[in-house]
């Protein structure tokens, strides 16, 4: 799910609901909702996605703490994503939450009931505590991580904290 405009969040989620109507999950098919990332999804749409996840008892996942640019975007309202979104006139009424990525998700009610956090490349000790406390799950994408030259992933720190961590592949855009 992608839509950074809070004014169209309801329309976006209605399209999602239409798409899943009539799909009956079974042992071989499950449904999930995946708001993309904090720089492509408004806080309003994140909240609505979480509500849909809870209402329909479906998996919810998002890309989070993937890049230093994302951390800068949320914490200070500066950097690459601000420039990019301004180019598309998408930050009209947006104000930076002035929070780290994980604290941002927690602040909007996303971190609960086993949500899936994709990447988590840049985490503080407090954020790791929060991931553990909320029983959130982490997906580490090693090829994407290597492709973009990120710093060491906190994989073993997460594993040693008994945080559920899985390996993922991310998109073809970040794999050779």
Segments predicted by a language model, with ranges:
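Metal-coordinating catalytic core of metallo-dependent amide/deamination hydrolases
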Residues: 1-115
